[in-house]
């Protein structure tokens, strides 16, 4: 018979369970999750990267994760790159209607300095991480290692030409945990391409890597459908 008092109360994004507060000697000790020093359990923080194509509910998962941590009484620092202004400079908004205020971080900002100069939080959640600079990703890695604060990053893997974003590339190199958030193409296959569509419904194959203005839209497509649309100059239904 299971002991209800010892049941986990939440499943965190990293796959670990959060248990009710108890004496350190009574806490479980999962392999690789922490270390014992005397009578204290010190949980070792990790850097998580959850990536997916457009429309895979990355922002929704980021905001739901924030809610879950706060429901447990934990303090969350919610951040996004300042270059992402689609929904407002300091707002994270999901397609399902969830939205939250977030700190917009400019590319020249030092995330270590920002974090260490504010009231300490229990976790950092970062959305649209593909737009962070590689140096800022390294700063998040430093906060995990030196300040023992978990960092959960959400973002795209590749741009509209299937090339890695610099921030995402660095996350693939230094993250402890990497998880794909899957979505599907209109044909039903797995979508991996973030296709850029112009005002006439044509797939764009040239331009700046980061372009958030104008009449262009983005949709998730499988590689086969994307290549066919490019080759045959097919019109794609815009979202």
Locate each region found by the language model.
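Positively charged N-terminal leader segments that act as targeting/secretion signals
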Residues: 5-23, 29-32
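Sensor-1/coupling segment of RecA-like P-loop NTPase cores
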Residues: 144-166
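Residues immediately C-terminal
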Residues: 131-132
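Short recognition patches in nucleic-acid-associated and regulatory proteins
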Residues: 184-211
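Conserved P-loop
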Residues: 42-115, 159-170, 180-183, 212-238
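Walker B catalytic acidic pair
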Residues: 128
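Short cysteine/histidine-rich zinc-coordinating motifs and their immediately flanking basic loops
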Residues: 197-203, 232-239
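Short, positively charged and aromatic/hydrophobic N-terminal segments
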Residues: 27, 35-40
């Amino acid at each position: 018979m299971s002991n209800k008092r010892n049941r986990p109360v939440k499943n965190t994004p990293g796959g670990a369970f959060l248990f009710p507060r108890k004496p350190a000697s009574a806490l479980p000790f999962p392999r690789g999750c922490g270390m014992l020093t005397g009578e204290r359990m010190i949980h070792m923080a990790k850097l998580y990267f959850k990536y997916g194509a457009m429309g895979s509910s990355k922002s929704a998962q980021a905001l739901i994760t924030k809610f879950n941590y706060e429901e447990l009484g934990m303090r969350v620092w919610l951040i996004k790159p300042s270059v992402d202004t689609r929904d407002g400079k300091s707002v994270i908004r999901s397609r399902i209607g969830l939205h939250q205020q977030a700190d917009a971080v400019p590319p020249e900002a030092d995330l270590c300095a920002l974090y260490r100069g504010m009231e300490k939080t229990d976790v950092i959640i970062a959305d649209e991480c593909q737009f962070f600079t590689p140096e800022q990703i390294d700063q998040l890695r430093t906060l995990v290692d030196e300040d023992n604060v978990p960092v959960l990053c959400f973002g795209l893997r590749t741009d509209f030409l299937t090339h890695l974003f610099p921030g995402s590339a660095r996350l693939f190199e230094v993250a402890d945990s990497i998880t794909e958030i899957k979505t599907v193409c209109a044909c039903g296959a797995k979508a991996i391409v973030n296709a850029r569509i112009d005002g006439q419904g044509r797939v764009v194959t040239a331009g700046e890597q980061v372009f958030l203005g104008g009449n262009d839209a983005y949709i998730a497509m499988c590689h086969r459908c994307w290549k066919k649309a490019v080759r045959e100059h097919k019109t794609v239904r815009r979202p």
